[in-house]
Every structure is written in structure tokens, then in C-alpha cells.
Amino acid sequence: MSYKSSHEALLKCMSSHLPRYQTYYNVVMAKSLTLLTVHAHPDDESSKGAATVAKLRDHGIRSILVTCTGGEEGDINNPAMDRPDVKQNLSQIRREELDKAVKIIGFEKLYLLGYRDSGMAGRPSNSRSDSFAQASLEEAGDKLIEIIRREKPQVMVTYHENQSGYPHPDHLKVHDVSIYAFNHSGDARYKPELGLPHQVSKLYYSAWSTNRAKAFHNKFVELGLKSPFSDERLNRSGNDEEITTRIDVRGYYRVRKDALLAHATQIDPASNFWFGLPDDLAEDLWPFEDYILVHSHAESINSADRIEEDLFSGLLDDN
């Protein structure tokens, strides 16, 4: 047998015994595959996409986290942390919580854009000159472009422009800044001092499924428990019809839970919303994290009757 044929046979044998993401080709390619996620505050990385990142980590794909603010205006939602010393040092404590969550989830790097939390819409803090809401689009966008050009992600996840269910100024700004950076990072003519151009191949929005909320609500009712989901939340139009991508994160529910609990100032361990159902039941009820593919420079596999199951589809060898 020639070297070429024996080598091809070896690759075929290896590929047939390796799980998804782990063909010989993908073992090599995964080292250079990168996901970049952009979030507004510490704890957002845990409530949106943590299980996906943990799963990618276990398959050798690196993930980069960009957190835009320090969460200084966050309410203390855990009674055990509602103390004067915590309130006086909230910024430092939230940074420590973020560092813990980053390690639990498995992000390779954390970048802080350095803006101050703007607070909920209508608060005086919205108008502070150092708040994220007041940052110029170009200034904040350039910070993100520099990160994109340095880390060279193929996939980027950010927020939907429709934040009607939670119209926080910083969440709205995350969307605008992300779109700006996505559109300019690959343009060689745009500010070469920020690094060599890099075009992100796929841009997603993280999605909160109304169907998921309804499934959890119905299970609470079935078990005779008080549902944490309001009528307004259940009747919200949501964006389920826009969902293109559903990542099966069975086996990673605990990672998401532990990451949430790392944010002790923000997450009450007794919260029915987060932890009202037993872990195994909650994971079986909706074992997915949902996304909306917004822009793609890769070949997409999703269609009207086929949901994408992989953020990197079209970028990996699927044979």
C-alpha cells in the first residue's frame, strides 16, 4: 500500500471513530476556531449562551468574552448579599464574580470595554458621561474592532435590536456597537492602526424563546408550583419565528447554573425563575440554547424545515 493510500485509510479510520467536531480534520481546525460573544454586564455571559460556550470548550474551540460595563448600577437581588459593605464595593465584587463565572464557563479570554453601567432606562445614571449609553458609536465600536482583529473569530454572538421585553440602554448599545464592529472590522481601509482586517464569517443574536417560557410555565402549573412567568411574558410575541439555530446543550445545564450562582449579588439561589425546577427536569424540558443567524459569509445549512445545530456550520468539514 502506498503512503498516500495508507494515510487516507488512517484518516478515514480516525474520522469514523470520533464524535462531532472531532474528525481528524476538525481536531486540527478546531485549534484555530474562535467564538466571540459580546455582553453588556457581568452575569449576562452566564444567562445567555454559557452552556454553548462550555460545550465548544470541551470540543477544543476557543471562546472570547467581551463585557462592555462593570455592572455598577445593578440591583442586589440576593438577600444574603444585601449588605452595606457589598453596596459600597459593588463594582469590585461584580468583577470578582465575573472572573469566577469566566473560569466556570471556560472562556479563554475576557476583555472589558471599560464603560460604566448606564442603569435601567430613565435613571439619572443614563446621562453620566462615562456610561456606555453615552459612549460614541465610533469610540466603542473601534474598541471592539481592535479585539476582533486581534482574536480573529469566525463566529460572533450579540444581542437582537428588538429589546422591547428588557429595554436596557446598555443592551441596546451592545447591539449597535456589535453591528458597527462587524461591518467595519473586515474593511482594510478602516483604521489600519486597529490591526489587520478580519471579517467575521457569521453573526448571531442570542434568543430568549417564548416557547421555552411557556414550556416551563406549563410544567410549574402541572406540578402545582407558582410559575415565575407573568402573563405579559407568556403573551410576548418574542422572536421564536426568527430562530435559525438550536444548540443541544444536554450535559451542560450544571455549568450554566454554577456560572449564574457565581454572580451572588445578582442571582438569588432561591429564585424560582432560575432554579424553580429540579436540574434534571429543567434540562430535559428545554435542553437547548437558541440563536438567530443574522449575517453569514459561510454556506448555511438551515432552511425553512431545517434548524441549524452548530454555530460553526459551513465553517467545518461536515462530511
Q: Model segments located where?
A:
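Metal-dependent de-N-acetylase/amidase catalytic core
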Residues: 7-10, 17, 21-36, 123-126, ...
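Active-site rim/loop-helix segments in enzyme catalytic domains that contact anionic ligands
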Residues: 21-152, 292-295, 300-303
